[in-house]
């Protein structure tokens, strides 16, 4: 039996889940990456509180899609059976690393970006100075650049998806796609403004463009810099996997004990 305390923010996107994948510190004095354990905790256990978190990328308050709605989970002396431990005590980082590799395009999210599809249709049907936008050489050049960047991310995601299901060992590939997707999404916000002007900054049904998707991308491009590790973290992972990172292990930045909101799991007798 373990007693879990603490909280976690930005939890999603499957709202109303029956189980929570949870990583918690099980050896406070242990070395980094060797002091945490992974649990699959029953969401109905006493002491668990879930609060919705509506983010900048939400279309409106109360939205429940994966982009705009996450959760904050609180654990208050939650008694967790030992058989909820996954991978053995203090092996949580190994389990988490596998989970992150799946998150970094191993889950099969390889469709064409819907923002691109809507943007292309808009430029084909909307007119400026009496002719379709797509007939403007500058517009065509920008569309070509947008497609090339988004397609590069999609193809690399497809490669990673294949590697997972072919049983191929991956190294830097997961973080590579995560880094490119984040930086491309942020770049896309500016590219859309260059194409659509002020219409890209409002979701007004009359003044906005592509059914509000352009404005939503402005917010989503910022929010998507965080999940699964920031761009700086992805670059560190890539460097380490390629063997060009720091030669000596470096201590990660830490908050003061009063500012820490980490989860801890203390073993107790059932």
Question: Which residues are covered by each model-predicted region?
Answer:
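Alpha-helical interface subdomain recognition
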Residues: 1, 72, 101-270
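FAD-binding core of flavoproteins
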Residues: 1-121, 128, 244-270
